[in-house]
C-alpha cells in the first residue's frame, strides 16, 4: 500500500498501486473542494471517503456502481450494511438469492466477491441528503470511474435516471449496463436480470463469470 497527504481530513489517503496513475490529480482536485464538502456532517465520515482505493483493480472484471453513499451510516464500502438493514443491499441480496438458490443468509456484501469492485460515483453526501455533494465530487468522480473502466470488462450502474448520460462521461470502451436502482418503485429491480446478463457479457469477452453467491454472509 502507498499513501499521499491532502490538506484536509482525512489528511492521508492510503491506496493500492493500481490507483497510482490518478493520485496526483485526485489530491489536487480534493484539495480544491474539501473545505466546501467538509462544512457538512458527511456520510461516510471523511476517514472512510477513500477506503475503496485500497482495492486492487488488476483482478477486477466488473464494477457495480451506485450514485452515492447511504445518506446515513455509509461505511465507505458501497452498498455495505453491516446490520443488513438497508433496502438497496437487501434487494440486491434477494435478486442474487433468486439467481443462485441461496436462501439462508444473514447479509450480503459485494466487496467480498472475486472480480467485483463496488463503487459510488460520488464519494460522500451531507448526512441525510442523498446527492447533496454531487457538485463537489464531479471532477474526482469522472477521474476515478474513468480509471476503473480501464481495468474492468463490465460497468453495471444502478439507477436509470442517475446514470442516464454515464456513457458520455466515459472515455474507455467498457461494456455498460444501466439498470434500475434497487429501491426503484413498482419492484422494477426485481424484474431486472442484470446479474445474469453480466456473466453472459463476460463469457463473450472470454472472461470468467462472477460467482455472485460469494457475497452472502451466513
From Swiss-Prot:
Function comment: Plays an essential role in viral replication as a component of the DNA polymerase processivity factor. Excises uracil residues from the DNA which can arise as a result of misincorporation of dUMP residues by DNA polymerase or due to deamination of cytosine.
Organism, as annotated: Variola virus
Active site (UniProt): 68 (proton acceptor)
Membrane spanning residue stretches: none
Protein name per its UniProtKB record: Uracil-DNA glycosylase
Entry similarity comment: Belongs to the uracil-DNA glycosylase (UDG) superfamily. UNG family.
InterPro entries: Ura-DNA_Glyclase_AS, Uracil-DNA_glycosylase-like_sf
Organism domain of life: Viruses
Molecular function per GO: DNA binding; uracil DNA N-glycosylase activity
Lineage: Viruses, Varidnaviria, Bamfordvirae, Nucleocytoviricota, Pokkesviricetes
Subunit: Homodimer. Interacts with protein OPG148. Component of the Uracil-DNA glycosylase(UDG)-OPG148-polymerase complex; OPG148 and UDG form a heterodimeric processivity factor that associates with OPG71 to form the processive polymerase holoenzyme.
EC class: hydrolase
This protein's record includes keyword DNA-binding: yes
This enzyme's EC code(s): 3.2.2.27
GO biological process, one term: DNA repair
Amino acid at each position: 500500500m502507498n499513501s499521499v497527504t491532502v490538506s484536509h481530513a482525512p489528511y492521508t489517503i492510503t491506496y493500492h498501486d493500481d490507483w497510482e496513475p490518478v493520485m496526483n490529480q485526485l489530491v489536487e482536485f480534493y484539495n480544491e473542494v474539501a473545505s466546501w464538502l467538509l462544512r457538512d456532517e458527511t456520510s461516510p465520515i471523511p476517514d472512510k471517503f477513500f477506503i475503496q482505493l485500497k482495492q486492487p483493480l488488476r483482478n477486477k472484471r466488473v464494477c457495480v456502481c451506485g450514485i452515492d453513499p447511504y445518506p446515513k451510516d455509509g461505511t465507505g464500502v458501497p452498498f455495505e450494511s453491516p446490520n443488513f438493514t438497508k433496502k438497496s443491499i437487501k434487494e440486491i441480496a434477494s435478486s442474487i438469492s433468486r439467481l443462485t438458490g441461496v436462501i439462508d443468509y444473514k447479509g450480503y456484501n459485494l466487496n467480498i466477491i472475486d472480480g467485483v469492485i463496488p463503487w459510488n460515483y460520488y464519494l460522500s453526501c451531507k448526512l441525510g441528503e442523498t446527492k447533496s455533494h454531487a457538485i463537489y465530487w464531479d471532477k474526482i468522480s469522472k477521474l476515478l470511474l474513468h480509471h476503473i473502466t480501464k481495468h474492468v470488462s463490465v460497468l453495471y450502474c444502478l439507477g436509470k435516471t442517475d446514470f442516464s448520460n454515464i456513457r458520455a462521461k466515459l472515455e474507455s470502451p467498457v461494456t455498460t449496463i444501466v439498470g434500475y436502482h434497487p429501491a426503484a418503485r413498482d419492484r422494477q429491480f426485481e424484474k431486472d436480470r442484470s446479474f445474469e446478463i453480466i456473466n453472459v457479457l463476460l463469457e463473450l469477452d472470454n472472461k470468467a463469470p462472477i460467482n455472485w453467491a460469494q457475497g452472502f454472509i451466513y
